[in-house]
């Protein structure tokens, strides 16, 4: 999903100074504890995995519900992070997809969270308290609350830097330049290595994700395929414990195609070919009919087609993003129902999670619905209950 950076400022999250609701000593102990858990490495843990066409989490194999929160790693109040995970746990949500990137081309003002600076052909990773230590706390809190995280490494869109931030620093005019540039890929891989090494032993990591919605408009599909194959193989060389996926929207699919834009190869993706890459553990697809010029009812075909493709490939598929700007329950509930009935689709993460933080409501990009509302009851509480009922009777 493409989201504006301004939303963080509107949500009161981007401009406040780094501080915690806890006493400073407690913050330091929390961060040291995170380091011990994340880097410690001696305690044997069961990592999330695939089992046939399903996912296995904490020894339980089945269908899992979750959500997205691009903003949680940019929060500066530990208590807010804990609140989100506590509410997720109480609601039965198991997976949260978070932005593992926050790229800039100029160093922000003190107190603004940023993860990596690209300038003049060089990249600097921020491991300080206004950098990756914020993501450290997200992982730490997720571990304590039993929530699993999908962490991605770069954005297709310009929000929070994205591929464009690399192009601005290293030179280039298109996504294809990024995918094929040795200097840019070297910087990108250095960032991957830093993030993976921090959390390599964490049971909270569900999967590493190459990018948010990688595209290469007008490119031959071999460009994205080669980049996905090389990058996923590199991640697996660093970490054989955790799963790896792409973050793709699911574009480029002949199976059950009606010829509409999302099924075409115009954005450079070939879903079937991506699934064939051995170092990709499961597929992802997104759904935004209003952005793609399709109808809401069409979304059911999109879900079924990707389930069929994954079934044929012998890999599960995660319905990783879906959303609308109004009538959430009426429009999104049918997609959830279709996903539950479709073999090959083994989890879904709605876009996006909302909650009331110490600064007020979390950012709303128009697709957000909030904890404790009627929409939350419909699309989370009722959905989790439907999943439990389905798993109880072994119907998926």
Curated annotation (Swiss-Prot):
GO cellular component: extracellular region
Keywords: Carbohydrate metabolism, Glycoprotein, Glycosidase, Hydrolase, Secreted, Signal
Presence of the UniProt keyword Transcription regulation in the record: no
Pfam families linked: Cellulase (PF00150)
Active site as annotated: 213, 321
Binding site for substrate: 99, 212, 288, 351
EC class (word): hydrolase
Main location: secreted
Superkingdom in the source lineage: Eukaryota
Keyword Lipoprotein belongs to the record: no
SUPFAM superfamilies per record: (Trans)glycosidases
Annotated signal peptide: 1-21
Molecular function as annotated in GO: mannan endo-1,4-beta-mannosidase activity
Reaction(s) this enzyme catalyzes, per UniProt: Random hydrolysis of (1->4)-beta-D-mannosidic linkages in mannans, galactomannans and glucomannans
Enzyme Commission numbers on file: 3.2.1.78
Carbohydrate-modified residues: 120, 270
Compartments (UniProt record): Secreted
Similarity section: Belongs to the glycosyl hydrolase 5 (cellulase A) family.
Function per UniProt: Endo-1,4-mannanase, a crucial enzyme for depolymerization of seed galactomannans and wood galactoglucomannans.
Name of the featured protein: Probable mannan endo-1,4-beta-mannosidase A-2
Organism for this UniProt entry: Aspergillus terreus (strain NIH 2624 / FGSC A1156)
Gene transcribed to yield this protein: manA-2
